[in-house]
Amino acid sequence: MSVSAFNRRWAAVILEALTRHGVRHICIAPGSRSTPLTLAAAENSAFIHHTHFDERGLGHLALGLAKVSKQPVAVIVTSGTAVANLYPALIEAGLTGEKLILLTADRPPELIDCGANQAIRQPGMFASHPTHSISLPRPTQDIPARWLVSTIDHALGTLHSGGVHINCPFAEPLYGEMDDTGLSWQQRLGDWWQDDKPWLREAPRLESEKQRDWFFWRQKRGVVVAGRMSAEEGKKVALWAQTLGWPLIGDVLSQTGQPLPCADLWLGNAKATSELQQAQIVVQLGSSLTGKRLLQWQASCEPEEYWIVDDIEGRLDPAHHRGRRLIANIADWLELHPAEKRQPWCVEIPRLAEQAMQAVIARRDAFGEAQLAHRISDYLPEQGQLFVGNSLVVRLIDALSQLPAGYPVYSNRGASGIDGLLSTAAGVQRASGKPTLAIVGDLSALYDLNALALLRQVSAPLILIVVNNNGGQIFSLLPTPKSERERFYLMPQNVHFEHAAAMFELKYHRPQNWQELETALADAWRTPTTTVIEMVVNDTDGAQTLQQLLAQVSHL
């Protein structure tokens, strides 16, 4: 009997089972213990293979692929700390709903807790973050193949969102020629190998029931809050709110067109919050709200009912309103709850939104990050997409810009970390094949710098704008102690990215004004490669501009 041959047959069943649940993209890091999984993936023509030498970046690459494809994406890593590097991407997927299948190779049980090399306690290491966790036994013909495939099917068939951790121990030898070992074991699955359906078919349960009193509530004064959703959902939500005559507060990730732009500015005006107090119901569609003033209003508002609609399970309301948590696909829910044509009930808010936007426009000429955030909609590629980083940049775009309705916007706003942003953007581009504009801060770019290796492989133009404000300037917006702010919060690195781009053979520009930036953008959109554009700005100008605008709009 060949151990290496049966390891590969065991792995082949696992990988083939994944294809029955829509897995097409598979991300692979180098490793020896994962050889059976890697070779099984390589031999399966159903997969599109992606590789990366850094497991943390690999997990985020898979996250980006899953965001766009809306299908589960598999990841293969070897044993040891390689597994732990998947933790950030797994956490993000659990909060934002992407489906990740983590196949982690492991040492067999007799090599755990005895000093063996690269052997750690992997089962359960992700605690409660995976939606499902499977700790497989070592491959053996004593366990029927139908148990293995149905175990995989059960986890994936009931997976609604988040990650699945499948721990796969393999004994040595890991290498060797294939022989007939385990062939009859594998063949007991019969014509399953020629089929395209799961061995065990289950379906996730998704609540989509119509609220019987909707006809009553749609006649009331309502507010629509739009969080993270798809581009198509964003357009439908905008039309739905317009028909109802309800004000729509659209997040940067809502893709609704933000008909009342600069919400995070005008929500700081007492006239706006006073008018919103008249709302009898708030319907929030989508989660992961960005704006600080929006979150403050959301926490303090007290309508008679607060409904949250999202297909992610669990509580999504940190303010714990009295109301309803409706687990449903947003588009499906809108169909079940049609709008009734009514006149808008808000008068003050549209005026404030217009005045806030005019205040922003009046400051758009200076070459700075706040102005870039406002102008970003002018720089979007046609038929393309936008990837927005975290920290200050996403807040500035949320507060100062107005993105087109239905234009795809992606970000990692679940745990809102700055790790893995470039890797996620790479996955977003690969899955879509679209021209992509990505914008991050300098610390975010440094954090995931080796992901520039992933950006060498793009199928359409990708522009990475690095806004270099020399540190974590978001802390300038917080009451951090001034005496320790630079040393312990901002942490300026005093670096530029020209040599990093050159190391990975990427095009690079450092524009000094808007004309140079626009020329660099126009050139970059002409070729299917990655261009790094570093925009060096005064350290605190972005944060100060936002604070000045907040003060100005609050007194309108």
Swiss-Prot record:
Pathway, per record: Quinol/quinone metabolism; 1,4-dihydroxy-2-naphthoate biosynthesis; 1,4-dihydroxy-2-naphthoate from chorismate: step 2/7; Quinol/quinone metabolism; menaquinone biosynthesis
EC code: 2.2.1.9
HAMAP family: MenD
Family membership noted in the UniProt record: Belongs to the TPP enzyme family. MenD subfamily.
BP terms from Gene Ontology: menaquinone biosynthetic process
Protein name as it appears in the record: 2-succinyl-5-enolpyruvyl-6-hydroxy-3-cyclohexene-1-carboxylate synthase
Keywords: Magnesium, Manganese, Menaquinone biosynthesis, Metal-binding, Thiamine pyrophosphate, Transferase
Subunit structure comment from the entry: Homodimer.
Cofactor: Mg(2+); Mn(2+); thiamine diphosphate
One Pfam family it belongs to: TPP_enzyme_C
GO terms for MF: 2-succinyl-5-enolpyruvyl-6-hydroxy-3-cyclohexene-1-carboxylic-acid synthase activity; magnesium ion binding; manganese ion binding; thiamine pyrophosphate binding
KW Manganese (keyword) present: yes
Primary role: Catalyzes the thiamine diphosphate-dependent decarboxylation of 2-oxoglutarate and the subsequent addition of the resulting succinic semialdehyde-thiamine pyrophosphate anion to isochorismate to yield 2-succinyl-5-enolpyruvyl-6-hydroxy-3-cyclohexene-1-carboxylate (SEPHCHC).
Keyword Cell division applies: no
Catalytic activity: isochorismate + 2-oxoglutarate + H(+) = 5-enolpyruvoyl-6-hydroxy-2-succinyl-cyclohex-3-ene-1-carboxylate + CO2
UniProt cofactor note: Binds 1 thiamine pyrophosphate per subunit.
Gene name, Swiss-Prot/TrEMBL: menD
